From Swiss-Prot:
L-aspartate binds at residues 169, 215, 447, 488. Its main location: cytoplasm. It is an enzyme of class 6 (ligase). Its EC number is 6.1.1.23. It comes from Arthrobacter sp. (strain FB24). Homodimer. InterPro entries: Aa-tRNA-synt_II, aa-tRNA-synth_II, aa-tRNA-synth_II/BPL/LPL, Asp-tRNA-ligase_1, Asp-tRNA-ligase_1_N, Asp/Asn-tRNA-synth_IIb, AspRS_core, GAD-like_sf. Residues 193-196 are annotated as: Aspartate. NCBIfam families: aspS_bact, PRK00476.1. GO terms for molecular function: aspartate-tRNA ligase activity; aspartate-tRNA(Asn) ligase activity; ATP binding; nucleic acid binding. This is Aspartate--tRNA(Asp/Asn) ligase. One of its GO terms (cellular component) is cytoplasm.
């Protein structure tokens, strides 16, 4: 046995005991023939006193040691209340160097700032630092809590395939060549969606797994090409059943950081979320809401406001902003694809100022403050144009205002469910936002193609797709979507109608989803589920900005791995064996055939 005790476990009750310890040299301090070594392992740090000069002079940071010694009370005045082991020290009797270390690319110290590229390139060193190590252990605890809760509720953990066929699910697949079937390819799953539905057909009425998922998306901030979901599906359930389960999971997870989340969590419809907050994942830690002014400006002479939608959001105290700050808002808006962000300053004397104010009628000027709830000293920002992008711009401005003015308390937690989302959206809009349309039709699914319409739209969703609402529900925390689910389609004819609307005829649907449609022929039960974005959930629990901080070996921008330098070319032999360059032989003409 290389050690008898963990370094972080030693306490006053161990005084007088001989112990064998193992760990890394954290810090070393020489004091006239005596060295004090902070020895660190996964459990914590203990101070080791080394009196042999020939031993301690050869020690360097991150050397790996085995120490045999006696636990002793620290001299009075030398206690360290910052350490759990701060009452004791270990007097070394034998020190063995188990391994040495080269000079480090950065210090193993959470108080030292280290660039992300260096951290990811040497991630194994970064994980020795207290912060990253704490995040990994918190993630493990979150896994444990979820598993225990679901196990108590009768859920069965089942692993689904990570090599499957390519099926359109809203993003691009990562594809893998099938060596034994040249010209054919596997795909890595974007989610376990189809398999978990087939498990319901198979009679596993309560399923879950902590699933690895893969999406070949264009680079977006804080996205990873491979990510983790807590994936759940159940039979004979309704929306309220899954929402209740989701709330139980959230409540248990947040108890890990000593936060009690009150339940039931409030619900808001998708339509209300977009109208009031300009987002389908609203941050409810503050109450600033958008105001629609389309009716208010219906007779306006101002050309910019002659638009399908006009809306506003108020920045409290914003009238005192310098011209430079107001110009910066215009650049901020342009970075989001807008032409700018119109504004009116409501001066302390009640007068309206700014470029927009001079274009308003006396009636509009007189009624504007009341219409938007502005007070003297506030700034009113406007967006005008098509409803969806205008609301999105105002919603982003709302959050920016919340941060800039201190309306958002970072210590607060605000959850909501967003329900009754549209079932479909124009395919062109989905593609423009970076998603992949499932079929060639004019409409594609907002969530995915397997989401059931609400009962009142069951007969009409394919005739009037713009009006159809889905049985979908997303859970949002502090403006982050942390989970989403739906009641699923479980009848073959309904699923075929959805595919047809999305531009998949019966032959295409059979080719791509035939195994699912076949399963629906044999008594598929009503079912529904939810998937939590596990990386985002743990990041929120850990209080970190990026999901990269809670993933053991994350990718950097563009899906690049600085540690292994993946992706990387493969050899010509590997290409040949994998059949990457396989081309089917052209069919030879029949020499006996005659021309017509």
């Amino acid at each position: 046995m290389l050690r008898t005790h963990d370094l972080g476990s030693l306490r006053s009750e161990h005084i007088g005991q001989t112990v064998t310890l193992a760990g890394w040299v954290g810090r070393r301090r020489d004091h006239g023939g005596v060295a004090f070594v902070d020895l660190r392992d996964a459990s914590g740090v203990s101070q080791v006193v080394v009196r042999e000069e020939e031993v301690f002079h050869g020690l360097r940071n991150e050397y790996v040691l085995q120490v045999i010694g006696t636990v002793s009370q620290r001299p009075e005045g030398n206690e360290n209340p910052a350490l759990a082991t701060g009452q004791i020290e270990v007097i070394a009797e034998k020190v063995t160097i188990l391994n040495t270390s080269d000079p480090l690319p950065f210090q193993i110290d959470e108080h030292v700032e280290v660039g992300e590229e260096a951290r990811l390139k040497h991630r194994y060193l970064d994980l020795r630092r207290p912060g990253p190590a704490r995040n990994m252990r918190l993630r493990s605890e979150a896994n444990r809590v979820a598993r225990e809760l679901l196990h108590r509720d009768g859920y069965v953990e089942i692993e689904t395939p990570t090599l499957t066929r390519s099926t359109p699910e809203g993003a691009r697949d990562f594809v893998v060549p099938a060596r034994l079937a040249p010209g054919s390819w596997y795909a890595l799953p974007q989610s376990p969606q189809l398999f978990k539905q087939l498990l319901q057909v198979g009679g596993f009425e309560k399923y879950y797994q902590i699933a690895r998922c893969y999406r070949d998306e264009d680079f977006r901030a804080d996205r990873q090409p491979e990510f983790t979901q807590l994936d759940i599906e159940a039979s004979f359930v309704e929306q309220d059943d899954i929402i209740s389960l989701g709330e139980s999971i959230v409540k248990a997870l947040w108890q890990l950081i000593d936060v009690e989340i009150p339940t039931p969590i409030q619900r808001i419809t998708y339509a209300d979320a977009m109208a009031r907050y300009g987002s389908d994942k609203p941050d409810l830690r503050f109450g600033l809401e958008l105001t629609e002014l389309t009716e208010f400006f219906k007779d306006t002479n101002f050309g910019v406001f002659k638009a399908p939608y006009v809306g506003a959001v108020v920045m409290p105290g914003g009238a005192s902003q310098a011209r430079r700050a107001l110009d910066a808002w215009q650049e901020w808006a342009k970075q989001r694809g807008a032409k700018g962000l119109a504004y009116v300053l409501f001066k302390e004397d009640g007068e309206l100022a700014g470029p927009v104010a001079k274009n308003l009628t006396d009636t509009e000027r007189a009624g504007l403050a009341d219409a938007v709830g502005a007070k003297p000293g506030d700034c009113i920002f406007f967006a005008a144009g098509e409803k969806t992008p205008s609301r999105a711009l105002l919603g982003a401005a709302r959050v920016e205002i919340g941060h800039r003015t201190g309306l958002i308390n970072p210590a607060d937690w605000a959850f909501c469910w967003v329900v009754d989302a549209p079932m479909f959206e124009p395919a062109a809009a989905a593609v423009a936002s970076g998603d992949v349309a499932v079929g060639a039709g004019q409409w594609t699914a907002v969530h995915h193609a397997f989401t059931s319409p609400k009962p009142e739209f069951m007969d009409s969703f394919d005739k009037d797709p713009e009006s159809a609402l889905s049985y979908a529900y997303d859970i949002v925390c502090n403006g982050n979507e942390i989970g989403g689910g739906s009641i699923r389609i479980h009848e073959r004819d309904v699923q075929e109608r959805v595919f047809e609307l999305m531009g998949l005829d019966k032959a295409d649907a059979e080719t791509k989803f035939g195994f699912l449609l076949e399963g629906f022929k044999f008594g598929a039960p009503p079912h529904g589920g939810i998937a939590f974005g596990w990386d985002r959930v743990v990041a929120l629990l850990a209080g970190v900005e990026s999901i990269r901080d809670v993933i053991a070996f994350p990718k950097s921008g563009g899906g690049y791995d600085p540690l292994t330098q993946a992706p990387a070319p493969i050899t010509a032999q590997q290409r040949k064996e994998a059949g990457v360059d396989f081309k089917p032989e052209a069919k030879k003409a029949d020499p006996g055939a005659t021309k017509a």
